[in-house]
């Protein structure tokens, strides 16, 4: 994923404002928080059958309680299963089966489509 460098305060404000509009759109239209969206995107981007919660927290730029809450909600909505490691109770594993991965990919596909539509609606 290519990230464009921001050259000045005007570009920064413009990008942050635009990102905030998209975050709002995702929350409103798909009924998920941006932290939940970030967790699902991480899982989609890293095709594994299991993930360590600690790795997800370290990768995302959110505080641990925010990610833990997002993971709990997503687990309750059957986007994945969450369990404690049998050998180390402190370690939380996120397990994704084929059906759950399909559910994640379907949601992210709908979000991507909506972002494309929003690009045509929002004045950049």
From Swiss-Prot:
**Residue intervals passing through the bilayer:** none
What are the GO cellular component annotations?
A: cytoplasm
Tell me a GO biological process for this protein.
response to stress
Give the GO molecular function terms. Answer: DNA binding; DNA-binding transcription factor activity; metal ion binding
The answer on whether this UniProt entry bears the keyword Transcription regulation reads: yes
Effect the entry attributes to changing residue 88 to A? Able to bind to the spa promoter. Fails to repress spa and aur expression
Q: What is the effect of changing residue 36 to A?
A: Reduced binding to the spa promoter. Able to repress spa and aur expression
**Result when mutating residue 21 to A:** Able to bind to the spa promoter. Able to repress spa and aur expression
Q: Which UniProt keywords apply?
A: Activator, Cytoplasm, DNA-binding, Metal-binding, Repressor, Transcription, Transcription regulation, Virulence
Quick one: effect of changing residue 54 to A?
A: Reduced binding to the spa promoter. Able to repress spa and aur expression
PANTHER family attached to this UniProt entry: ORGANIC HYDROPEROXIDE RESISTANCE TRANSCRIPTIONAL REGULATOR, TRANSCRIPTIONAL REGULATOR, MARR FAMILY
Quote the NCBIfam families the UniProt record gives. Staph_reg_Sar, TF_SarA
- Its name, as the record gives it, is Transcriptional regulator SarA
Native source organism of the sequence: Staphylococcus aureus (strain MW2)
Its taxonomic placement starts with: Bacteria, Bacillati, Bacillota, Bacilli, Bacillales
Gene name for this UniProt entry:
sarA
């Amino acid at each position: 994923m290519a990230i464009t460098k921001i050259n000045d305060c005007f570009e920064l404000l413009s990008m942050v404002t635009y990102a905030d509009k998209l975050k709002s759109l995702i929350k409103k239209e798909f009924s998920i928080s941006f932290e939940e969206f970030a967790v699902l995107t991480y899982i989609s981007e890293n095709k594994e059958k299991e993930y360590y919660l600690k790795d997800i927290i370290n990768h995302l730029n959110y505080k641990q309680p925010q990610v833990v809450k997002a993971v709990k909600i997503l687990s309750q909505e059957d986007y994945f299963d969450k369990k404690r490691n049998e050998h180390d109770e402190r370690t939380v594993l996120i397990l994704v089966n084929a059906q759950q991965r399909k559910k994640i990919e379907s949601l992210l596909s709908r979000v991507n489509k909506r972002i494309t539509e929003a690009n045509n609606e929002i004045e950049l």
